[in-house]
Amino acid sequence: MRGLNLKPSRVYQTAAALLESESISQAPPWYKTIGSVPPSEILTRTQPVQHRGSNGRPRTKKASKLFKPQTIVYEEDRIRQEFFRDHPWELARPRIVLENDGRDGQRCDWTRKEFYALRQEEEIERRIAKEEAEYVGAYFHKGALEVGMELEDKSYEDWKAWATKEVEAANLLKQGAYTGVGAESEDADVLDEAAEADEGVEEPATVVA
C-alpha cells in the first residue's frame, strides 16, 4: 500500500534546493511569497475517517432499539447499588428527615382523607359560585353528565321499543306452535269463508226484451 504523497506540500523546499544546486537560474514568481507567508494547511487531501468494516454478512433485520434513547447512568448509582448490596438492612431505615419514626405507612389513610377533604372543599366552592351566578340571572348549558344521561335514556327507549316488538313476534310464533295449525291452514279457512259468502249472494236477473 502506497503512503501519502507529500510532494505538493514540499514545493518550496524543492524550489530552494533547485536554486542552490543551480538547476534553475531564476526563482519562480511565487518563491518569495511562499517563503514569507507559508500556507496554514498542507496541500494534500486529508484521509477520511475509516469506518469499521462489516463481518461480511448482510444485515437484513433492522435494529429494534435504533431510536431508543441511551440510558443515563451516573457514578453515584453504582456506588449506591454497591452500598445497599453490602448493607441491605439500611433500606428498612427511614430516609426522610421529617418523618424518622419508621411508621410512614400509617399515614396513607391520613393523606387520602386530606385529599378527599380538599376535593370536597373545591366542589362546594364551585357549587356555591354556580348558585350565586344563577341567582343573578346567569344561564349555564347542560353539562357533560346531563347530556350523557339524555343520550343513555334515548338509547334505552329505542332498545325498549325494539325489545317489545321482538317479544311480540316470539309470542306469536309460540302460540302458532302450540295450536298445531299453521298459517297456510288459516289462510285456507279465510278463503273458504269468502267463497261461501259469494255463493249466498243471488245474481241479478237478466231482463229479456
Curated annotation (Swiss-Prot):
GO terms for molecular function: structural constituent of ribosome. Transmembrane segments: none annotated. Its main location: mitochondrion. CDD domains: At1g26750. Keywords: Mitochondrion, Ribonucleoprotein, Ribosomal protein. It is found in: Mitochondrion. One of its GO terms (cellular component) is mitochondrial small ribosomal subunit. The keyword Ribonucleoprotein applies. It comes from the Eukaryota. Belongs to the mitochondrion-specific ribosomal protein mS23 family. Component of the mitochondrial small ribosomal subunit. This is Small ribosomal subunit protein mS23. The gene is rsm25.
